[in-house]
Amino acid sequence: MLIQLDHVKKEYEDFTLELDMHIPENRVIGLIGANGAGKSTTFKLMLGLIRPDAGDVKVFGKKAGELSAEDRQKLGTVFSDSGFSEYLTVQQVGRIMQEFYPDFEPEQFYRRCEYFHIPQKKKIKEFSTGMKAKLKILLAVSHDSHLLILDVK
């Protein structure tokens, strides 16, 4: 299994998430639900960004909170409320990605940016909302990710 959530429970003051989910490799899965249903919480559990109050979360056969740096480099993530500093250009972001991800493919990334009309020398703060979303997705798929998690609104 690529992802396993077994008897997982996460409690907040006004919300409790309980779930079991097994996702095999080579699948495309969508989580659909109302705002506040627990989709983002589920993704954060999968990524080891938060710990469950009960149950086990495994990714690549390992506990999510114990993924190595090498394992984490296999993850491509897009969260609507995250990203690089808006004072950077796409070229600067590309150089940063090369430093952090050995499998980052800059030529492919820049080619895709051109295809989707993402200006490489303009600061991200000058981008439209749609251009920022495209950039996040292009970054997530430009480093040979084995698991892609998109949490967009």
Predicted ranges, named:
Residues M1-D20, E25-R27, S68:
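A short, flexible loop at the N-terminus of ABC-type nucleotide-binding domains that lies
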Residues G30, Q73-S80:
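ABC nucleotide-binding domain signature
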Residues I32-A34:
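The feature captures the beta-strand-to-loop junction immediately N-terminal to the Walker
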Residues L47:
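Helix-to-loop junction immediately C-terminal to a conserved catalytic motif
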Residues G55-E66, E70-D71:
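Conserved ABC transporter NBD signature motif
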Residues F79-K136:
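ABC-family P-loop ATPase nucleotide-binding domains
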Residues A133, S142-H143:
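Conserved signature/switch motifs of ABC ATPase nucleotide-binding domains
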Residues L148-V152:
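Catalytic Walker B motif of ABC-type/P-loop ATPase nucleotide-binding domains
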